[in-house]
Structures are given as structure tokens and as C-alpha cells.
Amino acid sequence: MTSNIVFSEKKQKDMEWAKGIVARIEADRREFVKYKDSRPITDIKHMIETSAELYGDNTAFYQKYKGDETFTAISYRQMIEKVNGLGTALIHHGLQGKRIAVIGENSSEWAISYLAVICGTGIVVPLDKELSKEELKHLVQRAEVSCVLCSSKYRSVFQDISAELDQSLMLVDFFAEKETEGVFSLSELIDEGKALLQKGERQFVEAEIDSDAMSVILFTSGTTGASKGVMLNHKNLAADLMVSPTVLKVNTWDIFFSVLPLHHTYECTCGFLMPLYKGAAIGYCQGLKYIVKNLQEVRPTMFLGVPAIFENLYRTIWKNIRKQGKEKLVKRMIGLNRMTKKIGLDLSGKLFRQITSVFGGRLRLMICGGAAINPQVLNGIGDFGILALQGYGLTECSPMGALNPDTAPNPSSIGVCFPGFELKTVDLNEEGIGEICIRGDNVMMGYYQMPEETAAVIDEDQWFHTGDLGYIDENGYAYITGRKKNVIITKNGKNVYPEELEYQLSLSPYIEESFVFSSTQPGESDISIVASIRPDMELIREELPTEPTDQDIKTILWEEVDKINKTAPLYRRIRKLILRKTEFVKNTSNKLVRFAEENKVE
């Protein structure tokens, strides 16, 4: 622990900065800024050390290892001991100030590796485990990585990469019991570091963090081509941690369920660092196929996800209800509960206990990010007594941009701006839609080795231009209509936002996913709006007495498209429909890769 170390002048200035953020939180008079118990932190090292002091015996991580029947609990005290041990060993092996990659499945080993690097060793480079060997090799070279801490699954991949590169990589296996083939064991390094600490080695534990220096390089999973390396510092992350729990109550007894990849800043900041800041616990999912099983074992209270996960879970609930022949009964129960809620009586806990037991029985909050979600799904989950909120963020904002307050959620909105951060729209069109811009301590330092790209998105007044289009209502709630680069402009200068149409199509139960684009045909005076649609074949088969033909499917889909066209101006109407039978191309964040789909169509 370093709580008794006298702060340097720089550290004292950092503490004044942190106290300033807390003061702005306390001064915020917006009704939905309800929770004002944030403690000032100067950096992530300061955060985990103070959390270990405050919550020492509380559980930090729940993890189930291969072959185990139950989850293992790791306390905050054990966590800090492991972090200090690993950090001390890494410095002893000559890695201070180096770039160190972390890659693997979500686990406490991933978390401890990340913390050991960022809290005094060097610069952490979280890598996407879904990338190919060639892509990983390219990123290792770009980031000038000296060491890779990885799960056993990726050991051989990086052994090959190391052999192909001019410089050798120090490799550390999360789960190896001992060093073999020149690959270090994480547990052995932790023990080595603990022994060095007992002998008086203090270089890691007494390291003073420069909160303004680059500490993280996060490579974005671009939907338009080459990824960019987002440079973050400790202030970016600390600012997010201090402001994010102000519109959302997080308790020390909460258990977060970690299923999204930790290399994504959404999960890393909100599902990993933020729970540790608030003294909560994190339960690691063993993989997507184990979600339901692990939910019942961990019995979490909070769950971060993306639309695809929430929509699949919600769809599964209703499919099970229909199979049991209880659809009418459940709908009556939902109607009854909605009525009693109006007089302050929430019966969901009693009425839907059997349904919510699928999630472990204690889940109180689900937060959706990464892309727009159907508000009907959020409301539908809420009907069962689980509050479902939508948020908004970007890697470039560490990632917090906006979040719906738990006391005043708006399912159609991405949320409100956090205390101390700023949100605005610029270059508004005749419909009042403009580009969303964000300013605050959460905004990145810039793109790694890309000064021109950085200058294109961060203006001279330090506003980050997100590239997202939308508007902000009179109550401060923000809404997204699409991406600036994806706007379809008709010959008359009218704007069509494909994401907006895709979102409207997603509201149909018969549509699994869609891709909207423009097409110009010979002899046509203007562009046509085209929708490529992948239907929900299971539901369509349930609706029809015989196996549906392509024409049957298109008839159903056109009925859904016509519902949208009836309320849309002529220039925004979908004129052509393409039946899609396979999934669309996605990146590792599960987002549609538009340029790949456009090339397919061409």
C-alpha cells in the first residue's frame, strides 16, 4: 500500500484535479444526478490501492476454472497482492516503461495482468482475441510490444509471431503451472514478485503514475477499414470512474456479470474498473454458450451487454413462454403489474420469479451499449422487474459519452451527459439533426502515430467530433439517428439515415437484421433506397401452415416495410427489398461492416 507516501507536487496537482471533478458532481443540480458519493482518484493505481483498503475482504472476482464445479472468490486484498507481485516481477524482468499486450478470455488473470501493467510497469495494449495471427502480428509491430500476457489458447500464436519478428517477445501464460518452452507462468511470476517484495524491492509499489502520459493503446475494430490506436491516459479513465456512478447506483453488494470482451473499452471501463472503484464484485462468464448456466451460478445483480445479447435473451424468454402455452397469462400479468406500478406497487418480484430465476434471481439492472437497441426490448425486460438502460460511448471517450439515469430512463434515448462533461450537436440541418460532439477529461489524447486523423476529430476547442448524427431534447436526453459517413443524400439534397431505417425495421418481430443502402438504376431519375433483410425464419415458420417459399417470406417482409413507408416522406421510402439468408458481415464488436456489405452488393 502507498497511502502513507508523501505526494509529489505533480501528485498534489492531480489530487486537486480529482477533487475538482467531485466538486462539479456535488454542484450539479440536475434531478437525475442522484448519487454524489464519488471519491477523488488521481489514477488507476490510486483507485485499486484505495479500493483494497476500503473493501479488503470483499470479493473482487468470481471465477470458475476448468474442471471446477463452483466459482472461486478472490478478495480485494488478494487482488492487490497479485497485482503488486506481478508488477514487481515484470519490472525485475526489464519491462518498466515498455508496451505490454494482454489477450485472452475474460478472467481474473486478464484483469490482474492489465492492472499490473498500467499501475507502474508500462503501457498496456489490450488485444482482440478474435483477430487472425497476421492481424495480431501487425498490431504487435505497430504498438512496439515487448511482452504478451495471454491465455493458454493464444500461447502458440504468439510463439509463432515472436519467431517471425526481429525482436523476441517475452511471453506469459495466464494458466501455465510453470515455465516451459521459454514461456513464463503467470502464477510463478506473481510468486517471484512477492518474494522480491519481501526482500525490499519497492520499485513497482512506490511507482508514481504520470496521469497525463499515455498508459493505454486500444485498437478500434473499425467498420470502414484499418483500425486506429486510441491513446488513453489515467486521467481519462479516472474521470470516467468518478462521474459514471452519479446517474447510476452501484453498491458494494452488487455483482457484475462479465460477458463482453475485456479488450473493448466499454467492458474494460464499465464492467471491470468501475465495479472495482465502487467495491462491487465481478463474475466472469465462461463463454457465450455458458451465459444462462453461469448467470444461475453467479446470481449477478448487474449485467452489461450489447443489443444482440439482450434481444436474444428476451426472444428466448418469450419462446419459452409460448412453448408452455402461457403467453396470454403472462401478458395479463404484465398488464396487471403495469397498473399496480402506477400506484407505487411493483409485483414483478412475485409475478415473474420463475422467469427471472433464469438469470439467477437477483438481476436488477442491465445496461446496453455498442449500438441502438429496440426500446420495446428494454421495456419488455423492465416488465419482468429488471431495469434495462441504454448508454452511449466510444473508445475515444474512454468510453463514457452518455447514459440513461436509473431514476428517469428514456428507452428511446442514449441518455444524458455526465457531470463535468459536455455534449452538443453542430452543423444542424433543417430537421435539427447535427453531429454529436463531446468535450471533457474523458476524451482521448489522440490516435497513435496518426496526427492528421487526430486533428480531423478533435478541434482547437478540444471538442471530439464523434461522427454520429443526432439531436438533444430540452431535457438533455440525446438521440442518435445515424453515422455522418453513412448518410445517403438524394439528388434533391435530402438526407436519409440508413441506421434509422434499420432501427425501424428491427422493431418488427419478423426481421432478424437488416442493411439499408442506396442504389441507382438505369433510367431512374434519383437514387432508390434498398433494404437487404434477414428474416426470423423460426417465427415465420410458426406463423405459416407449410414451409414458406421465398415469395411467402417476401410478402411478410413487404407488409412490415410498408408500415414504415406509410409514415415516411417519399424520398425516405424503401423501394426495393432483398431477401438475405445468411448473417451480415460483422466486426469483432458485432457491428455491421458496411463497406464489406456494400462491396458484396456491387
Give the positions of each predicted feature.
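Structural core segment of the AMP-binding/adenylate-forming
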Residues: 2-14, 119-192
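Conserved ATP-binding/catalytic segment of the ANL
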Residues: 417, 424, 430-490
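AMP-binding/adenylate-forming catalytic core of the ANL superfamily
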Residues: 131, 148, 440, 445-446, ...
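Conserved AMP-binding/adenylation subdomain of ANL enzymes
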Residues: 238-255, 262-352, 362
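Conserved C-terminal "lid"/linker of ANL adenylate-forming enzymes
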Residues: 515-520, 559-602
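Conserved AMP-binding/adenylate-forming core of the ANL superfamily
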Residues: 57-107, 111-115, 132-141, 187, ...
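Conserved pre-ATP/AMP-binding loop-to-beta segment of ANL
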Residues: 56-59, 194-219, 226, 249-255
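Conserved AMP-binding A3 loop
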Residues: 72-77, 215-241
